[in-house]
């Protein structure tokens, strides 16, 4: 899949890089002991450090450091055993210190990579430039008072990982796949919950365009704080088309920060884009360099779970799944665990088909996740056993599954209570076939005359007469014997 924009003077390709701000899973903030609980009353989780009271000194949260290293290892990135915190100087009402504690020249994590699973089954690689730790700012609220803006400092000082990609993406779909994969990895690791709707994962989107076939990077614009995968993809498309129009009309794209308006489907200028020197970075004199040894990194490495790519490869090898099915199943750790329970001792492909197409489809329709599924992995496995043992046929299995989604009942009990066992008595099926043929002599003659497509119609009628319980293979054999000899 290639995303190109045709213009009057050239065909343009899009160049995209993402800066993802991921809130670290930790009960306390990066440099203070204040809680990070979401949804608490305004200014109820603010320490003297968070409010930048004079004389208050930051103390590093060791868990946040470990979480950053875990994430770096999950991204197959270089871990820098010595990094430095720096002050990023700028003024804003919700930044009480007048600077943000971040990392600049020496981040905690260096280059890595993320492998994307695309919808067409292909894989693509996106480079990671760096990951650094920094503190979040507070929140300005403009809708709480008719004439004043208010400040909530609950978020001030919360630990963030800023994960900066290389400009390796060439289409909106790749950016979407990158965000989904990054979120999946961090959820497996337990380092970020990835809830974009709560602001715990936000993306700054860097977009530029260039004529196809050229290699120079043109001026980019940054779209700030986009809070959903869908909006990121829409923002890239809108901004790319805007830039193409500017270049095609003889103008020049200015380096600036922009905002995306989802309602209008367009980006608008926010301010001219700052350069690094505008922030006057310098090492924070209140914090020593962050140093750890190889033993610490290895200890963290040994604690890593099986990650999505490794799990996907195992599912392909152990269960014979297609790369696409395996990638769908491993997006969420809970989904993968559910599938493994269903597939244990059973045909992996059949289990994957039922989990992906039947269960996931029904749950999406009901607005639920696997954790809230009324159908347990054990009961779905029992349903597949009934199907394999030919106690029920495929059509009845779907009916039983619908009842299970509504009630959560055991499939064995449903089949017995409702008398849904498959009819495998040859004489009973023959009687039903004879009755349908006798009632439709003209159609029977048409089949004998060569219109074999009508056999499907007869199958449907017999199934209707037996309430869907006739064994399909036996039914087909009997029909063919009686109508085609």
Curated annotation (Swiss-Prot):
EC number: 6.3.5.-
Biological process, per Gene Ontology: glutaminyl-tRNAGln biosynthesis via transamidation; translation
UniProt xrefs under PROSITE patterns: GATB (PS01234)
InterPro entries per the UniProt record, alphabetical: Asn/Gln-tRNA_amidoTrfase_suB/E, Asn/Gln-tRNA_Trfase_suB/E_cat, Asn/Gln_amidotransferase, Asn/Gln_tRNA_amidoTrase-B-like, GatB, GatB_C_1, GatB_Yqey_C_2, Gln-tRNA_amidoTrfase_suB_CS
Entry keyword annotation includes Protein biosynthesis: yes
One Gene Ontology molecular-function label: glutaminyl-tRNA synthase (glutamine-hydrolyzing) activity
Catalysed reaction, written as an equation: L-glutamyl-tRNA(Gln) + L-glutamine + ATP + H2O = L-glutaminyl-tRNA(Gln) + L-glutamate + ADP + phosphate + H(+); L-aspartyl-tRNA(Asn) + L-glutamine + ATP + H2O = L-asparaginyl-tRNA(Asn) + L-glutamate + ADP + phosphate + 2 H(+)
Keywords, alphabetical: ATP-binding, Ligase, Nucleotide-binding, Protein biosynthesis
Family to which this protein belongs: Belongs to the GatB/GatE family. GatB subfamily.
Function: Allows the formation of correctly charged Asn-tRNA(Asn) or Gln-tRNA(Gln) through the transamidation of misacylated Asp-tRNA(Asn) or Glu-tRNA(Gln) in organisms which lack either or both of asparaginyl-tRNA or glutaminyl-tRNA synthetases. The reaction takes place in the presence of glutamine and ATP through an activated phospho-Asp-tRNA(Asn) or phospho-Glu-tRNA(Gln).
NCBIfam families: gatB (TIGR00133), PRK05477.1-2 (NF004012), PRK05477.1-4 (NF004014), PRK05477.1-5 (NF004015)
Subunit structure: Heterotrimer of A, B and C subunits.
Protein name: Aspartyl/glutamyl-tRNA(Asn/Gln) amidotransferase subunit B
């Amino acid at each position: 899949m290639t995303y190109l924009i045709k213009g009057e003077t050239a065909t343009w390709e899009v160049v995209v890089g993402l800066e993802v701000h991921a809130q670290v899973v930790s009960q306390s903030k990066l440099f203070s002991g204040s809680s990070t609980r979401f949804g608490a009353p305004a200014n109820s989780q603010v320490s003297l450090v968070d409010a930048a009271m004079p004389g208050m000194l930051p103390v590093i949260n060791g868990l946040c450091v470990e979480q950053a290293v875990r994430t770096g290892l999950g991204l197959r990135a270089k871990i820098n055993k010595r990094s430095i915190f720096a002050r990023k100087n700028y003024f804003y009402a919700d930044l009480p210190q007048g600077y943000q504690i971040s990392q600049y020249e020496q981040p905690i994590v260096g280059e890595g990579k993320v492998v994307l699973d695309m919808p067409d089954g292909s894989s693509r690689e996106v480079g990671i430039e760096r990951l650094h730790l920094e503190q979040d700012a507070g929140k300005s609220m403009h809708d709480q008072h008719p004439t004043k803006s208010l400040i909530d400092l609950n978020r001030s000082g919360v630990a963030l990982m800023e994960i900066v990609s290389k400009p390796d993406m060439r289409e909106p779909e790749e950016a979407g796949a990158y965000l989904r994969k990054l979120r999946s990895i961090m959820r497996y690791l337990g380092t970020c919950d990835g809830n974009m709707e709560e602001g715990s994962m936000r993306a700054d989107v860097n977009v530029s365009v260039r004529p196809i076939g050229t290699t120079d990077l043109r001026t980019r614009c940054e779209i700030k704080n986009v809070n959903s995968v869908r909006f990121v993809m829409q923002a890239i498309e809108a901004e790319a088309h805007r830039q193409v129009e500017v270049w095609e009309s003889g103008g020049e794209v200015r380096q600036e920060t922009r905002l995306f308006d989802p309602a209008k489907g367009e980006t608008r200028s926010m301010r001219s884009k700052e350069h690094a020197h505008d922030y006057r970075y310098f090492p924070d004199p209140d914090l020593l360099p962050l140093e750890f040894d190889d033993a610490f990194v290895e200890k963290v490495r040994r604690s890593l779970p099986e990650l999505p790519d490794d799990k996907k490869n195992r599912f392909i090898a152990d269960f014979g799944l297609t790369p696409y099915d395996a990638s769908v199943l491993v997006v969420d750790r809970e989904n993968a665990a559910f599938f493994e329970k269903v597939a244990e001792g059973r045909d992996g492909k059949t289990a994957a088909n039922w989990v992906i197409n039947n269960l996931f489809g029904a749950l999406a329709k009901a607005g639920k996740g696997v954790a809230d599924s009324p159908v347990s992995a054990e009961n779905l496995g029992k349903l597949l056993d009934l199907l394999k043992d030919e106690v029920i046929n495929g059509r009845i299995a779907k009916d039983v599954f619908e009842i299970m989604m509504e009630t959560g009942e055991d499939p064995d009990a449903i089949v017995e209570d409702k008398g849904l066992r498959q009819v495998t008595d040859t004489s009973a099926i023959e009687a039903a076939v004879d009755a349908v043929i006798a009632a439709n002599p003209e159609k029977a003659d048409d089949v004998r005359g060569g219109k074999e497509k009508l056999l499907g119609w007869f199958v449907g009628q017999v199934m209707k007469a037996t309430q869907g319980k006739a064994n399909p293979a036996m039914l087909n054999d009997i029909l063919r014997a009686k109508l085609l000899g």
